[in-house]
Amino acid sequence: MPVVIGKLDTAHDSAHPQRAFLFEPGDPVRFDAAWSAQQRWQTRLLADPSAPEAVWILQHQTCYTLGRGASEKHLHFDPAEPPAPLYRIDRGGEVTHHLPGQLVAYPVLDLQRRTPDLHWYLRQLEQVVLDVLAELGLEGQRLPGLTGLWLDNRKVAAIGVGCRRWITQHGLALNVDCSMQGFEQVTPCGLTGREVGRLADWLPGLTSAEVQPLLRQALAHRFGLVWEEEAR
């Protein structure tokens, strides 16, 4: 049975806010371009621990990604001839599908400024999604032993991260008003028998444009961020 979790008072201490640059591209972004941007910022933070952090909130052009140790058995197509670009990347987790209508958040944060613990960080990313859902009047669910968020046993948010010397990259993907057809090409997150959903299934007419400010606010609150600049 799913465990329903409400809001938790575990946000970063707002008395010590962290400067962060916010990037919100207006058009869907190629995955490799967003990945390169994260890597550059991660390198910057590794070289200068006092540098500001960064967050990307965007939508991707249609693609599939495989985590570090992900199995190709969860692909329902020939990886040599994918229906959309396929990337093997340096995050945890199995296969994920990205496409327009899905909001993706990529925080490049220094966990040593908070809690240097990846399990803590994954739970905080889940809490970001729970906070967004609560603002929409929806009660999200965590499932024991699994990472991500569900509504009525349908997964609406996938989470997978990478980390180098406690500097994070990658993050979360929240299905808002995306097409569901591409998910049939894979076993999302390698979870056989688990359905995938989108927020518009519960709130017809909801758009990514309406949810994006809520996601921005939830990330700032959860990690104690003060936006240094916005690039849209």
From Swiss-Prot:
GO cellular component: cytoplasm
Reactions catalysed, as given in the entry: octanoyl-[ACP] + L-lysyl-[protein] = N(6)-octanoyl-L-lysyl-[protein] + holo-[ACP] + H(+)
UniProt-recorded name of the protein: Octanoyltransferase
UniProt entry tagged with the keyword Transferase: yes
Binding, substrate: R91, G92, G93, E94, V95, T96, H97, H98, A158, I159, G160, G171, L172, A173
Catalytic activity, EC: 2.3.1.181
Native species: Synechococcus sp. (strain CC9605)
General function of this protein: Catalyzes the transfer of endogenously produced octanoic acid from octanoyl-acyl-carrier-protein onto the lipoyl domains of lipoate-dependent enzymes. Lipoyl-ACP can also act as a substrate although octanoyl-ACP is likely to be the physiological substrate.
Keywords: Acyltransferase, Cytoplasm, Transferase
Further facts: In the reaction, the free carboxyl group of octanoic acid is attached via an amide linkage to the epsilon-amino group of a specific lysine residue of lipoyl domains of lipoate-dependent enzymes.
A GO BP entry: protein modification process
